[in-house]
């Protein structure tokens, strides 16, 4: 994921920042507890496509 793109993208629901979870290939919104998938290098920023995250699950930013 390009860092410049990550700086621009926000959660479509709350407009909050997102964190890239490289291990699961997702963008995480900690406010709404949603994980948006990245498919073929393209973030899918649709609430219907997001999954609920588990509270306290660590995100691998590396």
Curated annotation (Swiss-Prot):
Belongs to the UPF0434 family. Pfam families: Trm112p (PF03966). It comes from the Bacteria. Transmembrane segments: none annotated. InterPro entries: Trm112-like. The lineage of its organism: Bacteria, Pseudomonadati, Pseudomonadota, Betaproteobacteria, Burkholderiales. One of its GO terms (cellular component) is cytosol. This is UPF0434 protein Rpic_2808.
């Amino acid at each position: 994921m390009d860092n410049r793109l990550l700086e621009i993208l926000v959660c479509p629901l709350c407009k909050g920042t997102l964190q890239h979870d490289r291990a699961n290939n997702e963008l995480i919104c900690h406010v709404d507890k949603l994980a948006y998938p990245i498919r073929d290098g393209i973030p899918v920023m649709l609430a219907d496509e997001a999954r609920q995250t588990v509270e306290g699950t660590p995100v691998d930013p590396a």
